Amino acid sequence: MVKLIASLLLLAVVAQAYGDFKCSLAVPEITKDWVDMKDACIKGMRNQIQEEINASYQYLAMGAYFSRDTVNRPGFAEHFFKAAKEEREHGSKLVEYLSMRGQLTEGVSDLINVPTVAKQEWTDGAAALSDALDLEIKVTKSIRKLIQTCENKPYNHYHLVDYLTGVYLEEQLHGQRELAGKLTTLKKMMDTNGELGEFLFDKTL
């Protein structure tokens, strides 16, 4: 008991000393002319970050479903877990871009909301790939809308538009084509061989 009281007293003394000696620095006044993104473009970027996070969570749900022992499609599971990681990384890169442009000084806690996953089960792999393609189309439309917002007057954020077009839109278009091709192949295999076709296709992912 004596040791406990002594420990508490020592902790109180250390806390007081820390409070007395900690350094408090004033925020220096520097020009904000370099912080030039406009509100509509900033809002669009924030919305796009949320779109990427929403897609990431949906892909996580897909990966978890195909990982079930009662479903057991490891190829599909790995494919969707990889897609979830990619979408999360997209969101992180957009956050980094906003930070680089001096835009994460307020409202950071509202930047990302944990979404409710719309769907958690699928009848087969083809249904999941079809949903994945729809999801990518939705994200692509959102990026295009953001590009249109940021490239038009009075915003003219050419650097951001080039970044979104050259990196994100390029990847989205390739991703859509890849998913469409996988879905076509899977449907052909299932039309011929049913569940065996899905089983064999899973091995290729």
From Swiss-Prot:
GO cellular component: cytoplasm; extracellular region; ferritin complex; fusome; Golgi apparatus
Disulfide bonds: C41-C150
InterPro entries to which the protein is assigned, alphabetical: Ferritin (IPR001519), Ferritin-like (IPR012347), Ferritin-like_diiron (IPR009040), Ferritin-like_SF (IPR009078), Ferritin_DPS_dom (IPR008331)
Entry's EC annotation: 1.16.3.1
Binding-site residues, Fe cation 1: E52, E87, H90
Highest taxon of source: Eukaryota
Keywords, comma-separated and alphabetical: Disulfide bond, Golgi apparatus, Iron, Iron storage, Metal-binding, Oxidoreductase, Secreted, Signal
CDD domains for this protein: Euk_Ferritin
Keyword Metal-binding: yes
Sequence ranges assigned to domain Ferritin-like diiron in this UniProt record: 35-190
Record has Glycosyltransferase as a keyword: no
Disruption phenotype: Embryonic lethal with some embryos displaying cuticle and nervous system defects. RNAi-mediated knockdown is lethal at second-instar stage at 25 degrees Celsius and first-instar stage at 29 degrees Celsius. Reduces Fer2LCH protein levels. RNAi-mediated knockdown in the midgut causes a growth delay and most flies die at the larval or pupal stage; lethality is partially reduced on an iron supplemented diet and enhanced in presence of the iron chelator BPS. Few surviving adults have a smaller and shorter intestine.
GO MF annotations, alphabetized: ferric iron binding; ferrous iron binding; ferroxidase activity
A Pfam family that the UniProt record links to this protein: Ferritin
Positions that bind Fe cation 2: E87, E136, Q172
Tissue: Expressed in hemolymph and gut (at protein level). Expressed in the head (at protein level). Expressed in thorax and abdomen.
UniProt xrefs under PROSITE patterns: FERRITIN_LIKE
Reactions listed under catalytic activity: 4 Fe(2+) + O2 + 4 H(+) = 4 Fe(3+) + 2 H2O
Induction behaviour: Up-regulated by iron-supplemented diet in the anterior part of the gut of third instar larvae and adults (at protein level). Up-regulated by iron-supplemented diet in the lymph gland.
Subunit-level organization: Oligomer of 12 light (L) chains and 12 heavy (H) chains; L and H chains are disulfide-linked. The functional molecule forms a roughly spherical shell with a diameter of 12 nm and contains a central cavity into which the insoluble ferric iron core is deposited.
Family, as annotated: Belongs to the ferritin family.
Protein role: Stores iron in a soluble, non-toxic, readily available form. Important for iron homeostasis. Iron is taken up in the ferrous form and deposited as ferric hydroxides after oxidation. Ferritin is composed of a heavy (H) chain which is responsible for the oxidation and uptake of ferrous iron, and a light (L) chain which facilitates the nucleation of the ferrihydrite iron core. Required for dietary iron absorption in the midgut. Involved in tissue iron detoxification by exporting excess iron. Functions as an antioxidant and protects the developing organs from cell-mediated ferroptosis.
Official protein name in the record: Ferritin heavy chain
Organism: Drosophila melanogaster (Fruit fly)
Taxonomy of the source species: Eukaryota, Metazoa, Ecdysozoa, Arthropoda, Hexapoda
Gene behind this protein: Fer1HCH
